[in-house]
């Protein structure tokens, strides 16, 4: 509808704020979670937008605590979520859906996960702690680069072969994590970049 706020509108507001150095909006920082949770409880499509992931994580926790209580789990049945990354032939980047079922916690490649089913009947293995998943995935790829670099400077053919084998194993571990574990986040907050092209009933920057 015409009342929707587009992300382009928000970006223009932020740029204007940066240019003239004056505050835009009436909501104080400590009121964001209360305002957003109230809008969501009243059936509005509300999203908190920020440039930094640290801000997103902080407000996501605060908003979800107001919606579901202090002991809220990573996923709640009935809650909209978005995929932060894509998995080929499984789930697309920025795919949104509503959680309809949650399985028991399991370890997948050493990472705590739960089976999450969305309203479009899509089921994925989702990391309970996205940061843990990212750190392990990146760690294996960095190990691959390090071992590969070491193999290129050694003159010992046996050592070179061993280093290359270890590098391939590290790369394989990284890709298994990347391809087997989804990164889902509740749709209460998003980076401005991720939200480009989206429309919301209420957008808070």
Regions found by a protein language model. Name each.
Residues 1-148:
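Conserved helicase motor core of P-loop NTPases
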Residues 98, 106-205:
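Conserved helicase C-terminal RecA-like lobe
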